[in-house]
Amino acid sequence: MQGPVYGLSTAEADLHPDLLPNFHYDDIFGTVVNRFLVQSVAGIPLTVYGGGGQTRGYLNLKDTLQCVALANRNAANKGELKIYNQLTETFSVSELAEKIKAVARAMGYPVEIKSIENPRREREEHYYNPSHSGLIELGLDPHFMTELSLIHI
């Protein structure tokens, strides 16, 4: 399982602007992180669906590349199955909104959070506690969602 990926910078992408990844912020291809970042600089309240309790695992783009390389270097033997959960942190939608609001306000954007009716058919509160130690044990050096990492996006 891979959690939603955020971030734009990788060692390779930083070499040339043509290597930058896509930045989707829409409801279909985008992540809530990107949507909140765009809303914050556009002066639109961060729209939290329902109570904002929807929790997911998140992964920095740099870590996605590390995970693929680590899994490749530690491939399963014939007849063996290895499954790695690709995530480094979990956040609820409300936690992400508060995190991005704080960063945007520190940068001078007057950001607010607005709860709207959830347009999705999903449980807003659920048990979610995924194990993600496998890749850490293989040597994953996580890049966590810090204030600085959000500013760089």
Regions found by a protein language model. Give the residues of each.
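Histidine (H) residue identity feature
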Residues: 2, 16, 22-27, 126, ...
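C-terminal substrate-binding subdomain of Rossmann-fold SDR/epimerase-dehydratase oxidoreductases
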Residues: 40-151
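A conserved pocket-lining segment of Rossmann-fold NAD(P)-dependent short-chain dehydrogenase/reductase
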Residues: 3-59, 80, 85-87
